[in-house]
Amino acid sequence: MLDRDLTLSDDAYESSPVSRHKTHTVKVGQVKIGGNNPIVVQSMALGAHIDSDNIKSSAQKYAKEVIELAHAGSELVRIALNSEEVAKAIPYIVEEINKEGFDGKILVGCGQYELYRLIQDYPDNIKILGKIRINPGNIGFGDKRDEKFEKIIEYAITHDLPVRIGVNWGSLDKYLSQKLMDENSLSSNPKTSDVILRKTLVMSALGSAKKAEKIGLNAEKIIISCKVSRVQDLILVYTALAKSSNYALHLGLTEAGMGNKGVVNTTAGLTYLLQNGIGDTIRASLTQRPGESRTNEVVVCQEILQSIGLCYFNPQVSSCPGCGRTSSDRFRILTEEVNGYIKTHMPVWKKKNPGVEYMKVAVMGCIVNGPGESKHANLGISLPGYGEKPVSAVYKDGKYFKTLQGDNIFEEFKEIISDYVEKHYT
C-alpha cells in the first residue's frame, strides 16, 4: 500500500502551456516574429564567392544555398553584407528565391563595419531585403558612432525595414564596456568580470534599441539579440532582457561548436529559455564539418521546438536504443527505413494531409516496452526481441491491429503508414 504522505497532489502532474513572454510582433515579409506567433526558425548561409566580373552567375550559386535552407524549413535566411559584390548580387539572389516560390523577403542582411557605406552606395539593393541586422559594437568609432547609427536607422525607417540590433560578446561597444568596468572598480562591492560582461551586453542592446526608437523606428520594427558562447551566460542575459523589455528576442549562441557539442550546447540553452517563455526566433550556430550540409542547423532548431511541444514539423518517430534483448540490427534497420520513408513523403503530405506533422510512430526492438510504447503512438510496431524472428506486432491508435511476418515487414508497414495518413489527415 502506498503511503499517502509520500505522494504529491494531482496538481503536481498537470501540464500547462508555456506562458510566452509578451513581446512586440515584428513582421518580416510574410513572417511574423514575436507576440503570440509561432517561434520562427532561421539560419545563415555560408555564402559563395561573388565574382565581380560575373555578379549574376555568382549570385545564382549563392541563391542555391539560401533556397536549400528555405526548403529545409528555414523561414528566414541571413547573408553577410560584407562587400560591394554582395550588395550588387542581392537583386539576383532575391530573383532566384522568388522563382523557387519563396518570398524574397526571407533574405536578411547581416551588416557589420561595411553597412553604413553599403546603404549609401547601394540603397536600392539593400532596401529589398526582408530585414537588416546591425551590431552596435561595429557601427562606428569615436565621434562617428552616433552619426552612423542614426543614418542606418533613418535608412531603415525610410524603407520600412525591420532591424535586429544584434550585440555580440566578441565585438562589444568598447566605450560602454570600459565605462562599466571603471564604475565597477570604484564600487564598494565590485562584481566579477562575467557579471559586468553580461550587464554590458544587455545595456548595449537595450540602449541601442531605445536610441533607435528615439530616432523614429517603431518598437514593432525592432528585434534584439545578445550573442555569447556559454550556455549559462545565454540564460542569464536573456532572462535579464525579458525582464527589462518587450522587444522581440532572437535566441542563439554565437558559436555553439561542431558535432554533438554544438547540438548539446544549443539545445541546453534554448530549451531552458523557450520553456520559460523567452524567445521569438531561434538559430543554431553550428560549425559544419567539411562537406556537411548547412541545413543541419535548421533540423536542430525544429527538433528542439518539437521536442518541447512548441511547434510541430514532422511526425515523431520513437525508437528504442537496443540492449541484450535484441540480438540483431533488424529493428535499427526498420527504424532507419521508417524515418527515411516519412522524410521522403513529407513534402507531399504537408500540402495534401494537414496535421500529419502531429502523427506519432513507434519502432521498438523487443516485447519488454514494445507493446506499451506502441500503444502510446498513432502507429506502433514491436519486434519480438531475442531471436529476432521476422515477426512484428502492429498497433493502431493504442489497439492491436495485426502481426506482420516474413521478409517484407517494412514494405507492409510502409503501406500501413501511408493508409493511415490518407485516412486520418485530410
From Swiss-Prot:
Keywords: 4Fe-4S, Iron, Iron-sulfur, Isoprene biosynthesis, Metal-binding, Oxidoreductase
Source species: Wolbachia pipientis subsp. Culex pipiens (strain wPip)
Official protein name in the record: 4-hydroxy-3-methylbut-2-en-1-yl diphosphate synthase (flavodoxin)
Keyword 4Fe-4S: yes
Function recorded in the entry: Converts 2C-methyl-D-erythritol 2,4-cyclodiphosphate (ME-2,4cPP) into 1-hydroxy-2-methyl-2-(E)-butenyl 4-diphosphate.
Cofactor(s), names only, from the UniProt record: [4Fe-4S] cluster
Name of the gene encoding the protein in the UniProt record: ispG
Binding site for [4Fe-4S] cluster: 320, 323, 366, 373
Region (Disordered): 1-20
Cofactor remark: Binds 1 [4Fe-4S] cluster.
Family the UniProt entry places it in: Belongs to the IspG family.
MF GO annotations: 4 iron, 4 sulfur cluster binding; 4-hydroxy-3-methylbut-2-en-1-yl diphosphate synthase activity (ferredoxin); 4-hydroxy-3-methylbut-2-enyl-diphosphate synthase activity (flavodoxin); iron ion binding
PANTHER family, alphabetized: 4-HYDROXY-3-METHYLBUT-2-EN-1-YL DIPHOSPHATE SYNTHASE, 4-HYDROXY-3-METHYLBUT-2-EN-1-YL DIPHOSPHATE SYNTHASE (FERREDOXIN), CHLOROPLASTIC
Gene Ontology process terms (BP): isopentenyl diphosphate biosynthetic process, methylerythritol 4-phosphate pathway; terpenoid biosynthetic process
InterPro entries xref list: Dihydropteroate_synth-like_sf, IspG_bac, IspG_bac-typ, NO2/SO3_Rdtase_4Fe4S_sf
Entry EC number(s): 1.17.7.3
Annotated Pfam families: GcpE
